[in-house]
From Swiss-Prot:
This is ATP synthase subunit c, sodium ion specific. The keyword Transmembrane applies. F-type ATPases have 2 components, F(1) - the catalytic core - and F(0) - the membrane sodium channel. F(1) has five subunits: alpha(3), beta(3), gamma(1), delta(1), epsilon(1). F(0) has three main subunits: a(1), b(2) and c(11). The alpha and beta chains form an alternating ring which encloses part of the gamma chain. F(1) is attached to F(0) by a central stalk formed by the gamma and epsilon chains, while a peripheral stalk is formed by the delta and b chains. Signal peptide: none annotated. It comes from Clostridium paradoxum. It is a multi-pass membrane protein. GO terms for molecular function: lipid binding; proton-transporting ATP synthase activity, rotational mechanism. GO terms for cellular component: plasma membrane; proton-transporting ATP synthase complex; proton-transporting two-sector ATPase complex, proton-transporting domain. NCBIfam families: ATP_synt_c. Inhibited by dicyclohexylcarbodiimide; the enzyme is protected from inhibition by Na(+) in a pH-dependent manner. It comes from the Bacteria.
Amino acid sequence: MERALILAASAIGAGLAMIAGIGPGIGQGFAAGKGAEAVGKQPEAQGDILRTMLLGAAVAESTGIYALVVALILLFANPLLNLL
């Protein structure tokens, strides 16, 4: 019974962790839109805008990657099962 409860809670936790991937997707879309708008207003600053936008996208994506790692650990290398 305890093993089934831990596996169910791990699956729910993995699902909640993957919901965290929604935020970076929305943020990156918003940043890309604003970056395109900025390049449209100042085409001569395209290099600086692109560099800043890519750095921001990388930082935002790290949250989604961390959530994916947590979900994979909970599903495939569950450390809680060793406590039983």
